[in-house]
């Protein structure tokens, strides 16, 4: 007789996030793993939201660069205090454009930047942003 054993529930956390800059307004939610890696960062596994009113439709694959920004792969990591890494996360919008917000620790002073690419027109920008993220309490 075989017994049915329920699969363990996938543990995850939900974070709300937003960033703004010159002509930029993006916000939404992240789903992350529930357990941090050895450096205290959580892997972003899902994304929802919009950038300048255009829906975000997918998260860029870890280890890949957004189209139009070769050599700068994303790691989709965020730490408990809401800081992104120097690789940041990447996403695609419904308009076919891509964004890669990240923490620019190489700048003086350090701060957040967004790389935005428009592959159809080879558009590219890299602008300072103010980024915030917070855990959404489980109900």
Language model features by range: what are they?
Residues 1-6:
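Hydrophobic h-region of N-terminal signal peptides that target proteins for export
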